[in-house]
Amino acid sequence: MHPYLISIGSFHLPTYGTMLAIAVLAGIYTAIRLGRRVGVDSALILDYSSWVILVALIGAKVLLIITLWSYYRAHPEEIFSYATLKLGGVFYGGFLAALFFTIWYVRVRKISFWKMTDVLVPSVALGTAITRLGCFSAGCDYGKPTTAPWGVIFSNALAHEATGVPLGVRLHPTQLYESATTLAIFAVLLWWSPRKKHDGDVFLGYLGLYAAGRFLLEYLRGDENRGFVFHHLLSTSQFIALLVLAGISGVFIWRRVHGSEKASALSEGSSTEFSQVAGANAGQRKNSRGNHKAKRKMQNSKPV
C-alpha cells in the first residue's frame, strides 16, 4: 500500500504514525465529550490521557518482545533498535498496561473506576478503527491468502521489508476487517452509553465485543510471527481474549449474586418496616376503639 504518506527527499512521513496521531486526538476529543455528559472533568481526562498513551505504547512494545522472545533472545541488541521502535506492538499489551495504570490512577484520584472506564472505552474502539487503517497502509497485521474478490495485493517493497507482508499475493484485508469491527463496536457503545443501567456496563460490553471479534479475526491473520501458545493452537491474542471473556463472565456472575443479595436484603428490610408500621397502626386503632367505648360509658352513666 502506502507506508509513507509524504516523501520529500530524505523526509518521510509514515502513514501508520500519522493515523496513530489522528487516533489519539480523536480518542481524547471523544472522551472529553462523553465525560462532560456524566460530570468527569475535562482537565482530568487530558491529564490521564497524556500518561496513559505513553504507558500503552510501552506495554504494546513489551508484549511484542515477549511474543517474539526467541528472536530477541538471540538478538538482544534489537530490543532497543530503531527497527523495533518502528513496529506497532501488540494491542493487548498496550490495553493491559493501560488498564493497570487506570486502576492505579483512579485510586490516587479517588474517582470511580467503572465510571471512568465507561467514558474511555468508546475512544479506545474509535482509536483502534483509525489505527488499523494505518496498519493497512503499512502492510502489518496482514491476512492469509484468499481467492475472495475483495482480497488485496501488496506491491510495495518497503512494506515487505518493514513488515514481511507477501508481495503479489491476494490476501484477506484483516486490517480493514478489524477497523470495520471496532467502528461498529464504537457505534454500539455510543448508543449504549446513555442507556446503561449500571456504571461499568459499557466497559464490560466493550471488552466482550472486542474479545469475541478479535478471537474470530485471528483465524484470518497470516502473519505467523505474532506469537502462539499451546503448540500453535491459539495465537497470543486469542488466548488473552479467552481470559478476558472468562473474566467478564466472572464479573457478571458476581454482580448477579451480590445484586440478588442486595435486593433480598432490601426486600426483607421493607417487609420488616411494613410489619412495624402495620402493627403500630393496629395498636392505634385498638386504642381509639377503647377510648370511644370509655367515652360512651361515661355519657350513659347517671349521677347519684
Where does each model-flagged region fall?
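A feature for loop-to-transmembrane-helix boundaries and adjacent hydrophobic helices
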Residues: M1-N291
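Arg/Gly-rich low-complexity intrinsically disordered repeat tracts
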Residues: K293-V304
